């Protein structure tokens, strides 16, 4: 089993982190700067930022002083929102025993356990904010390393 983001989801998280580093509702960040800072493909970065804007997480401003910024403070943006903006709803859609849609949820021995695991993952993403990621990122940059379990308090 591989629980991983698609490339689009990965890029969306990195782009949101870049905007969050600027303090959220602060100054606008140029598309080019997001791409360079977060090692994103320059040709794909505008699409990723548009996904965040369409989800109401970021806003764009045209012009010399334009770019993108978060619409809310980083502490109010859950990682789950960013992931779902890029990936769609984080749900249990495939039967792990038979593949395809799950039609046996009321009689399946695995369904309850699998649903609980998915919900635990959703809860973790819901409780982790962009401010948490900025704090963890700063700790890593300062040589503190990656937290062993969870994120440090913001």
Where are these regions (language model features)?
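Conserved segment of winged-helix/HTH DNA-binding domains
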Residues: 74-99, 110-119
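C-terminal regulatory/oligomerization modules of transcriptional regulators
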Residues: 99-154
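Beta-hairpin "wing" of winged helix-turn-helix
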Residues: 56-71
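Alpha-helical residues within the helix-turn-helix
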Residues: 36, 53-54
């Amino acid at each position: 089993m591989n629980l991983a983001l698609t490339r689009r989801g990965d890029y969306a998280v990195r782009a949101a982190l870049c905007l969050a580093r600027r303090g959220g509702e602060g100054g606008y960040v140029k598309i080019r700067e997001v791409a360079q800072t977060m090692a994103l493909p320059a040709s794909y970065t505008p699409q990723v930022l548009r996904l965040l804007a369409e989800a109401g997480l970021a806003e764009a401003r045209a012009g010399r002083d334009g770019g993108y910024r978060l619409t809310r403070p980083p502490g109010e943006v859950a990682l789950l929102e960013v992931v779902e903006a890029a990936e769609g709803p984080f749900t249990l859609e495939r039967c792990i025993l038979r593949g395809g849609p799950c039609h046996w949820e009321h009689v399946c021995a695995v369904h309850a356990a699998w649903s609980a695991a998915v919900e635990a993952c959703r809860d973790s993403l819901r409780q982790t904010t962009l401010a948490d990621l900025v704090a963890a990122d700063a700790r890593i940059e300062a040589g503190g390393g990656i937290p062993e379990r969870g994120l440090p308090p913001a």
